[in-house]
Amino acid sequence: MTLPGLLQNNGIETVNSMKFSILAALVCALVSPLAGAQNYPSKPIRWIVPSTPGDGSDAMGRMIADRLSREIGQTVFIENKPGAGGVLGSEFTAKSAPDGYTMIVGNAGSHGVNAGIYTKLNYDVVKDFVPVALICTTPNVMVVNPSVKVKTMAEFLAYAKANPGKLNYASGGVGSSAHMSAELFKSMAGIDMAHIPYKGSAPAVNALMADESQVMVGNLPPWSALIKSGKVQALAVTTPKRHHSLPDVPAMAETLPGFDTLAWFGILAPAGTPKAVVTRINALVNQALEHPDVKAKLATLSCDPAPSTPEAFATRVTADVARWKKIASERNIRAD
């Protein structure tokens, strides 16, 4: 073969080799995530709870994690990272590898309210997370210590207006959904109460029971048994209509038309988590929510199972962020 012919053939072979290499790289890029998702999970999965043991996110996370562990052949374990109203656990999750092995049990406070009250977050509540699965929704409930001698919302409002500054209300931290719900209530009712923030909802509940504070607007689950036992007085749930678990407790909107704050709990992952992984965990959580044991447990906690798609959950998160940003701005509430 002549030299020009040899060079020509080598050139063709080189071009073909380059084409093959590029094609192989593209195939690998497409196949690798799918292969990883098919093998997922190949090790234990960590769910971060951005609050103390015993609060709503902790209870929901442990219940669903236990059910998933039985289904997938790997342990889904809870790791509590409380602090700054959910900021510490959220930041940790946002900066974790988006491989499906670290997710967060978020809520309306950590992934709704915080975007409005923190101006210096090291993560974006919307952009740095992908909503995976909504677990349940529940109203907040306004309760008072028995030392406050009232039985109805009308009696409470009359007492609060006659005794300005004498009532303290507890919350699980500045910017928690309990804090924001109470501030919205104060604004709409035209009353004055001092805020005492605690490091998590469990200490806040204990504080109200000890009469360190007299009032709390908190997620319904920790209060259900205490309300039904008569240890605290429930004045209203924070949804437009009464909740089926407490039919005798009025809706806040019956006294303050338009009042509506719904709490939610759900699983979110770091942005960039493979869609196949998100889809699988979503399906597993939705499946768990249909299990009789889970339904029964949610009923005892006064929570309504809320199976959903990742897209619908994302819409809820985005709407919550916009709403609480507006309320935080109007009430000049800042946590930093």
How would you label these PLM feature ranges?
Residues L3, N9-A24:
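Bacterial N-terminal signal peptides that target proteins for export
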Residues G11, S42-P44, M188, K228, ...:
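An extracytoplasmic/periplasmic, membrane-proximal ligand-sensing/linker region
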Residues A37-K127, K166-N168, V174, G190-V215, ...:
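N-terminal (or domain-start) structured segment
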Residues R62, D66, R70, A154, ...:
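Solvent-exposed, polar/charged alpha-helical surfaces in well-ordered, non-transmembrane soluble domains
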Residues K95-Y101, A108, G116-P203, M252, ...:
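Hinge/capping helix and adjacent helix->loop/strand transition within the periplasmic-binding protein
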Residues H111-K120, K186-M188, V215-D248:
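A ligand-binding cleft/hinge motif common to bilobed small-molecule-binding domains
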